[in-house]
C-alpha cells in the first residue's frame, strides 16, 4: 500500500469507520424488485452521466436479468442538482414547480429558449418505473452553510417525484445515491488531498440518508464503500479524485446493482463483452437523441424556419434505431448477435431536404495557383500552398491547425459538420499530421493521428498527448508507442454544451504555462463538474484549463457569437477573434 493511501485524517477516519460499522451502505432493507420489461432511468449529476461512457452498470443489470428485457436510459448531466437542471432549449432550468426557491444563486436569466421536453415530460416519455438519482456532489461545495437548503431541495424533489405516475400506472420506485468519496491523488498530481472535500461529502451523504429515511425511499451510501476502496485498492479508481475511471466504474456497477436491486448472480456472465459492446452502441444513439448535437435547430431558438421540415423525422428515426439496439442488448445477453444494418434499413425514411441555395453567382471554388493569384498579401509576406484536398482527400472542412515542435502541420477536419444525421455512417472526423519530407515547401506525407472523431473544432498539444474538443467532452488522445497514432482516449471533463455545434469549446491555444484557453459561443449552457467544484457558463465566453492541476476556470463571460481565435501578445495579453 502506498504512503498516500495510508495517510488519512484521524478524525475523518474514525467518523467514517463508525458510520460504516453502523449503517453499511444501503438504508431501507427492501431492495427494488425487477419486473419483466422494467424501465429504469438514471437522473442527476456527472457521476451518473459519465456512466454512459463506460456502460458497466447497464451491462451488469442485463447480465443479472437477461430474461427481463430491461429498458435503461441515462438522463443525468453535469452540474445538475435535485431542482436545477438547465438546458439550452428549455425556457426554465427548474426541474419541478417550486425548485426555484432553493438554488437561488443560479436563478439568473440565461436566455435559454425552446421546446425541449421538461424532466417530467421525458420521464413520462420513457415510462419510468424505477428512478436512480445521483445528487450531492455539486451541492457539497456550498459546505455546512448550504446543508439545510440542500435537504429542503432534496425533500421537495422526493415529494414531487413520489406524486408522479410516469409509467401511467403507479408511482415510481426511487433510489437516492450519495456522492462517492474524494480519492487522494495529491502525491501523483497537483490536486486537492480530499480532506476538506470528504468532510463536506460526508455531511451531504448523511443529509441524503436523513431525507430518504423521512420519505421511506431507498438510499445507497456510495461514500463509505468508495472510501474503503481507496484505502485497500492498489490501483487508482478515479481519474482526478472525483471522477471514477474504468476500473472504478466496474466496481461501482456492482455496488449499485447489489445495493439497489439486491445481490443476484450474473447468470449471463459468459456474454459480458458482447453485452457491454451492445450497451455502448445503444448509449451512443441515445446520447444523440437526449443530448442531440446542434439542438438549437431541433428544439431551440433556431428551430424556425427550417427545423420543422427536418428534425422531427430525424428524431423519430434515431429513436427507432435506439430501440433496435435495446433488442440487440437482449439478444447479446443470450449470446446472440443482430444484423443492425438490416434492422436500421427498416426504420422510417427521411424526406428529401430541399436546399435554400438560390444559385446566385458563379459559385466556383478556386484551387492552387488560381486561388493564390486572387489573394493580396501585405508587403514583406509570401503565401504558398502547403497542402490541398486535391492531393489529400482527408483534408475536408479543416477547422483548426497548429505546428508541432518537429515542424509538422496538424489539422483538425470535420466532414461530419454540422452534426451526425440519423441513418448516416457514424462520424469519422480526423486529426491529421502533414509533413514535408523532401524540403520543397509542400506536404508530401499524411498521417492520421486519430479518426472516428466528431467535430474537432479545437485541439492543443501537451506533453501527455493532445487535448481535443469533442462535443460535450474535453478528451485527451495519447500515443503511447510513438507511432504517431493515438491509442488511448481519456474523457477529461464533461458537461460542455454543443447545442450549436460550431459554438462549442474551440480555437484552443496554450499560454506559456501550458494551460489551454478555449472559446465558447452564444446560446450554450455549460455545466462542468471539476475537482474544485462546478464551473458554469452561459451565452459565450472563454475557459482556461490547467492540465497540471486538472483545473478549469471561466476567465470571461460575454455575449460573443462565434469566437474562432485566441492569441497572446508579448505581454501575455489575450486577444479574442470572432
Identify the function of each model-found stretch:
Residues 35, 52, 236, 240-364:
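Conserved catalytic region of serine esterases and O-acyltransferases that act on ester linkages
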Residues 184-222:
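Substrate-gating cap/lid alpha-helix
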Residues 11-21:
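Bacterial N-terminal signal peptides
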Residues 348-578:
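Beta-propeller domains with acidic blade repeats across secreted/periplasmic ectodomains
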Residues 25-79, 83-91, 119-127, 131, ...:
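Serine-esterase "nucleophile elbow" of acetyl-processing enzymes
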Residues 34, 43, 54-55, 92-151, ...:
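Oxyanion-hole/transition-state-stabilizing segment in secreted/luminal serine hydrolases
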Residues 39-43, 71-76, 129-135, 173-178, ...:
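Structural recognition of the beta-strand scaffold that forms the well-ordered cores
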Amino acid at each position: 500500500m502506498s504512503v498516500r493511501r495510508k495517510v488519512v485524517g484521524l478524525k475523518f477516519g474514525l467518523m467514517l469507520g463508525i458510520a460504516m460499522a453502523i449503517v453499511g451502505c444501503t438504508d431501507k432493507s427492501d431492495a427494488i424488485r425487477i419486473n419483466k420489461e422494467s424501465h429504469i432511468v438514471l437522473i442527476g449529476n456527472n457521476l451518473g452521466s459519465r456512466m454512459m461512457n463506460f456502460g458497466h452498470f447497464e451491462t451488469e443489470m442485463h447480465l443479472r436479468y437477461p430474461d427481463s428485457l430491461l429498458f435503461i436510459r441515462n438522463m443525468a448531466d453535469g452540474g445538475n442538482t435535485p431542482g436545477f437542471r438547465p438546458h439550452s432549449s428549455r425556457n426554465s432550468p427548474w426541474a419541478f414547480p417550486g425548485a426555484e426557491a432553493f438554488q437561488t444563486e443560479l436563478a439568473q436569466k440565461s436566455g435559454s429558449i425552446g421546446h425541449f421536453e421538461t424532466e417530467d415530460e421525458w420521464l413520462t416519455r420513457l415510462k419510468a418505473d424505477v428512478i436512480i438519482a445521483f445528487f450531492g456532489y455539486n451541492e457539497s461545495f456550498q459546505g455546512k452553510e448550504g446543508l439545510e437548503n440542500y435537504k429542503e431541495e432534496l425533500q421537495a424533489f422526493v415529494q414531487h417525484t413520489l406524486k408522479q405516475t410516469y409509467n401511467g400506472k403507479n408511482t415510481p420506485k426511487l433510489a437516492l445515491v450519495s456522492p462517492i468519496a474524494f480519492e487522494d491523488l495529491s502525491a501523483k498530481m497537483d490536486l486537492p488531498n480530499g480532506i476538506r472535500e470528504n468532510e463536506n461529502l460526508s455531511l451531504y451523504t448523511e443529509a441524503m440518508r436523513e431525507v430518504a429515511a423521512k420519505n421511506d425511499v431507498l438510499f445507497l451510501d456510495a461514500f463509505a464503500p468508495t472510501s474503503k476502496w481507496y484505502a485497500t485498492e492498489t490501483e487508482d479508481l478515479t481519474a482526478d479524485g472525483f471522477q471514477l475511471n474504468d476500473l472504478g466504474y466496474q466496481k461501482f456497477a456492482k455496488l449499485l446493482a447489489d445495493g439497489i436491486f439486491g445481490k443476484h448472480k450474473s447468470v449471463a456472465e459468459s456474454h459480458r463483452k458482447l453485452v457491454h459492446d451492445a450497451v455502448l452502441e445503444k448509449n451512443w444513439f441515445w446520447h444523440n437523441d437526449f443530448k442531440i448535437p446542434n439542438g438549437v435547430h431541433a428544439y431551440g431558438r433556431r428551430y424556425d424556419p427550417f427545423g420543422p421540415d427536418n428534425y422531427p423525422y430525424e428524431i423519430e428515426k434515431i429513436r427507432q434505431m435506439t430501440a433496435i439496439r435495446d433488442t440487440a442488448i437482449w439478444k447479446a445477453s443470450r449470446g446472440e448477435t443482430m444484423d443492425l444494418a438490416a434492422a436500421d434499413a427498416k426504420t422510417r425514411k427521411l424526406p428529401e431536404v430541399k436546399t435554400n441555395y438560390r444559385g446566385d453567382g458563379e459559385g466556383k471554388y478556386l484551387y492552387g495557383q488560381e486561388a493564390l493569384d486572387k489573394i493580396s498579401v501585405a508587403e514583406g509576406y509570401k503565401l504558398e500552398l502547403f497542402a490541398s484536398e486535391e492531393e489529400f482527400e482527408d483534408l475536408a472542412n479543416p477547422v483548426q491547425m497548429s505546428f508541432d515542435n518537429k515542424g509538422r502541420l496538424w489539422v483538425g477536419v470535420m466532414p461530419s459538420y454540422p452534426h451526425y444525421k440519423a441513418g448516416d455512417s457514424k462520424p469519422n472526423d480526423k486529426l491529421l499530421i502533414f509533413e514535408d519530407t523532401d524540403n520543397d515547401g509542400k506536404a508530401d506525407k499524411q498521417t492520421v493521428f486519430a479518426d472516428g472523431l466528431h467535430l474537432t473544432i479545437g485541439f492543443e498539444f501537451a506533453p501527455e498527448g493532445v487535448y481535443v474538443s469533442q462535443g460535450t467532452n474535453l478528451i485527451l488522445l495519447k500515443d503511447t508507442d510513438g507511432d504517431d497514432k493515438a491509442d488511448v482516449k481519456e474523457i477529461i471533463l464533461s458537461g460542455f454544451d454543443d447545442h450549436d455545434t460550431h459554438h462549442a469549446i474551440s480555437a484552443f491555444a496554450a499560454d506559456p504555462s501550458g494551460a489551454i484557453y478555449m472559446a465558447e459561443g452564444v446560446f450554450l449552457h455549460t455545466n462542468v463538474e471539476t475537482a474544485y467544484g462546478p464551473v458554469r457558463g452561459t451565452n459565450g465566453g472563454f475557459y482556461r484549463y490547467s492540465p497540471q492541476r486538472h483545473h478549469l476556470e471561466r476567465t470571461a463571460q460575454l455575449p460573443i457569437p462565434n469566437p474562432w481565435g485566441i492569441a497572446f501578445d508579448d505581454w501575455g495579453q489575450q486577444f479574442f477573434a470572432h
